[in-house]
Regions:
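Transmembrane helical elements of multi-pass membrane transporters/channels
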Residues: 27-46, 148, 159, 182, ...
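Residue-level signal for short hydrophobic patches within transmembrane helices
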Residues: 18, 22-41, 45, 68-75, ...
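Helix-terminus/linker motif at the lipid-water interface of multi-pass membrane proteins
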Residues: 37, 41-60, 129-136, 192-199, ...
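Transmembrane alpha-helix boundary and packing residues in multipass membrane permease domains
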Residues: 32, 36, 48, 85, ...
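Hydrophobic transmembrane alpha-helices of multi-pass small-molecule transporters
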Residues: 71-74, 186-190, 216-220, 292-295, ...
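Small-residue-rich hydrophobic transmembrane alpha-helices
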Residues: 59-119, 156-175, 269, 282-346, ...
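Short alpha-helical transmembrane segments in multi-pass integral membrane proteins
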Residues: 1-29, 87-152, 196-252, 308-373, ...
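Short runs within selected transmembrane alpha-helices of multi-pass transporters and secretion channels
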Residues: 80, 148-167, 175-186, 204-219, ...
Length: 458
């Protein structure tokens, strides 16, 4: 029978409900940052190999698929957020039975969703890319990439849900190691398939899917072999209705929010597509570089959500509130520091991906708007993490969809439609981040804090 010992945790787990808060948040988020940066380095290797050995059309084909993939995947990945919150809260409350039911429900759900999403994405790739007005010289390669990518969706889902289980109990180091291994597989296959066998877009997609399978196998082996409350058991893999309701209550709004965010990003990508393949390539490279800042900031979002959830389950209101302020401070420092540094060295960084001067110039237009203001995105995400961590799901979804998604769409249909200028298009990002953060902060101070103050120790 699984049980918590006398306050002892596994050697890979971080105790979130006791001890100094900031060092433990940094210990939790540090491996997440390294994991995300490693993943982006491997993704960057994809883009660098394609950009230098297959030309800007192949680069545009790979770069232009991100918003479509996110649109199809985010609603289901949001359920992974719900699973992480449910597991973390039960872990903080030391309710082993409920925690294990949530874990096995989540992993069963991941398998079914991976198969369903993979089939849909494979079948609908080309029609959806047509709806996005993909340039004629890009759409064939983009459709091929999306189809191959979605063949690996079951592995992608199982890895992400398995990693969410591990993060919920404070284990962020082992997923980092597994990603290092799978990422190395990705890079080696990229070099082999693109440079040696000249498979271009197909080679990049196959390498990506292969690396996802490797990471899935490593995470599943870890969960099956671990000794403790998170051990995975095939005989327990079933859908528990109560756990499913809790996962859906938190995760579905998060997933809908992510997908509807992607709707606005698809609209932005469609607007970028109207400028031609050189602008699409520059936008894709700049976006790829921005990802290094985003992944570091997103680690604070995950830390805030997990720490708030565990301490909420443990009935510790002061630690819940201090979690927010620690994460807001850290994410501001990361966003401003990394954003300004990358903007300063933007041209040589862009040149690593593609040497064409016009591609670099187009990418720098995006960087000049996004990089100095990117910390606002981090502040917005930390507020969302705090609200989800204490059990609010509908509120952050409505605020985010209104303040970010809807505002961006209105901006594109009005301000950008009048100017048809890249800088004006990109300004929709910082404006929406600031408005959404401000509304989230007001909701937290006026509504959520009352709920937190009523907590009683478990």
């Amino acid at each position: 029978m699984f049980r918590f010992g006398s306050g002892k945790r596994g050697r890979h787990e971080i105790v979130m409900t006791e001890g100094p808060l900031l060092p433990r948040i940094l210990a939790f988020s540090g491996p997440l940052i390294l994991t995300g940066i490693l993943q982006l380095l491997y993704n960057a290797a994809d883009v660098i190999v394609v950009g230098n050995y297959a030309g800007h059309e192949a680069l545009a084909a790979v770069s232009s698929t991100g918003s479509l993939i996110n649109l199809l995947v985010n609603v289901f990945m949001g359920l992974g957020v719900g699973a992480s919150v449910a597991i973390a809260r039960n872990y903080g409350a030391r309710d082993v039975k409920a925690m294990r039911k949530a874990e096995h429900t989540a992993m069963t759900l991941a398998l079914f969703m991976g198969i369903a999403v993979g089939a849909f994405g494979f079948a609908m790739a080309r029609p959806l890319l047509r709806m996005m007005d993909s340039p004629p010289d890009v759409i064939d390669g983009a459709a091929l990439y999306v189809r191959i990518y979605f063949l690996g969706m079951p592995a992608n889902m199982l890895y992400n849900f398995g990693a969410a289980v591990m993060r919920a109990v404070g284990d962020t180091k082992r997923p980092m190691v597994y990603l290092m291994i799978s990422g190395l597989v990705n890079v080696l296959l990229n070099l082999l398939l693109v440079i040696v066998f000249h498979m271009d877009v197909a080679g990049v997609a196959i390498a990506t899917v292969a690396s996802q399978v490797v990471s899935m196998v490593l995470v599943l082996l870890c969960l099956f072999r671990t000794r403790g409350v998170t051990q995975l058991n095939l005989r327990e893999c079933r859908i528990d209705r109560r756990s499913l309701r809790e996962i859906i209550r938190i995760g579905l709004p998060a997933g809908l929010q992510g997908s509807l965010f992607s709707v606005s990003n698809v609209l932005i990508q469609s607007s970028v597509n109207s400028f031609g393949s050189l602008v699409v390539a520059g936008n894709g490279v700049a976006s790829n570089i921005e990802g290094f800042v985003y992944t570091a900031m997103n680690a604070q979002h995950q830390a805030c959500m997990t720490f708030a959830s565990q301490n909420y389950g443990a009935g510790k209101p002061d630690r819940v509130k201090r979690t927010l302020w620690c994460c807001l401070g850290v994410v501001t420092a990361i966003g401003l520091g990394m954003g300004l540094l990358i903007w300063l060295f933007g041209k040589p960084l862009m040149g690593l991906y593609n040497p064409e001067e016009q591609v670099i110039a187009n990418g720098m237009i995006r960087m000049a708007v996004i990089m100095p203001t990117y910390f606002l995105c981090g502040l917005m995400d930390v507020m969302v993490g705090q609200l989800r961590g204490v059990g609010y799901s509908i509120m952050p979804m409505i605020v985010s969809l209104t303040g970010a998604c809807l505002l961006r769409i209105v901006w594109i249909l009005t301000v950008f439609a009048q100017a048809h200028d890249l800088t004006v298009l990109y300004l929709s990002y910082p404006v929406s981040w600031f408005v959404t953060f401000a509304i989230h902060f007001l909701c937290y101070m006026l509504i959520a804090q009352k709920k937190i103050n009523q907590l009683k120790p478990v």
